[in-house]
Amino acid sequence: MVDDSTRKTLSNIPLLQIRAGPREKDVWVQRLKEEYQSLIKYVENNKQSGSDWFRLESNKEGTKWFGKCWYMHELLRYEFDVEFDIPVTYPTTAPEIALPELDGKTAKMYRGGKICLTDHFKPLWARNVPKFGIAHAMALGLAPWLAVEIPDLIEKGIITYKEK
C-alpha cells in the first residue's frame, strides 16, 4: 500500500514514544517536545531534498496548530492556510487537518475545509498509535491529499494562481 518514496520519507521521520494527549497535562509537555523534534527533522529532510512544502506553529499549549502549506504546479506556487486542533483523545485520534479557503471546492473535504483522510490514512494511523505524530499526519495525510486534489482543482479552474 505504501510506495518506496513514502516509505523512505517515513523512515526519516522520528517515531514518537510517549502516549499522551492534551488532557494529561504533565506528560503532554513531553509528548509536545517529541512532536516538535519530529516536525523539525521532517522539515529539515524536506529542505535537504528540495521538497519544502509547509510551515506550522502552535499555540502555547500545543493544542491549536496553524500555518501555511504550498503545492508547486507547473512552476507556480499555490499557497494555502492550514490549521488543526489536537483532539482530546490524541494520539488515539488523528488530527483533522483543514484548509479553510478550499471549503466546499472538492468532494474530498468535510465542512470547515477539513480534508478527507478516512480511507487510507486513518487505518494506518490507528495501527501506529502512539508512534505517529503531527509530522506523520502531514507526510501521510496532507501531502498526498494535496498531490491528488490541487492539480485536479487547478485543471477544473476551481482554484487559480494568485500573484504575490
Swiss-Prot record:
Keywords: Ubl conjugation pathway. The keyword Ribosomal protein does not apply. GO terms for cellular component: cytoplasm. It comes from the Eukaryota. CDD domains: UBCc_UFC1. Signal peptide: none annotated. Pfam families: UFC1 (PF08694). GO terms for molecular function: UFM1 conjugating enzyme activity. The active site is at residue 116. GO terms for biological process: protein K69-linked ufmylation. SUPFAM superfamilies: UBC-like. E2-like enzyme which forms an intermediate with UFM1 via a thioester linkage. This is Ubiquitin-fold modifier-conjugating enzyme 1. It comes from Drosophila ananassae (Fruit fly). The lineage of its organism: Eukaryota, Metazoa, Ecdysozoa, Arthropoda, Hexapoda.
